[in-house]
Amino acid sequence: MNLSNLRAPKKANRNRKRVGRGMGSGHGKTSTRGHKGQRSRSGSRSMRGFEGGQMPLHRRLPKRGFTNIFRTEYTVLNLSRLAELNETELTIDAFIAKGLLDKRNGLLKILGNGELTTAITVHAHKFSKSAQEKIEKVGGKAILVA
């Protein structure tokens, strides 16, 4: 078997359906649209979500909840990520410089997934309980930034 004589399996590559090209093709005359009716006319396309007059799914389901416009969103970082950085002190500016924190939404929360081996001082807006315990266990400091 060579690259020059490879063949696709039967029915793998099907021909495109060419409509309106004579009765012999099987798709002539009405071009698979049937006779009369809205769907047979040109430019007919039902709107997205239309289910033939039945109440559509997006209207059958109830509305739930609301969007809180005062929600504060934090960028979260785990201790495992901090351990990879090999730094002794991590300030907010250091996180921004390394591309881990966005300048526009500069709120940072440290989570406790992972382990630390060296003592580090971390400045952040929030710490989870487990993160704070793990940082202080190895002799580091978790400093809250206002």
Swiss-Prot record:
GO terms for molecular function: rRNA binding; structural constituent of ribosome. Residues 40-49 have a biased composition (Low complexity). Pfam families: Ribosomal_L27A. One of its GO terms (biological process) is translation. Residues 8-20, 30-39 have a biased composition (Basic residues). Keywords: Ribonucleoprotein, Ribosomal protein, RNA-binding, rRNA-binding. Residues 1-58 are annotated as: Disordered. This is Large ribosomal subunit protein uL15. InterPro entries: Ribosomal_uL15, Ribosomal_uL15/eL18, Ribosomal_uL15/eL18_sf, Ribosomal_uL15_bac-type, Ribosomal_uL15_CS. Binds to the 23S rRNA. PANTHER family: 50S RIBOSOMAL PROTEIN L15 (PTHR12934), LARGE RIBOSOMAL SUBUNIT PROTEIN UL15M (PTHR12934:SF11). Belongs to the universal ribosomal protein uL15 family. Part of the 50S ribosomal subunit. SUPFAM superfamilies: Ribosomal proteins L15p and L18e (SSF52080). The keyword Ribosomal protein applies.
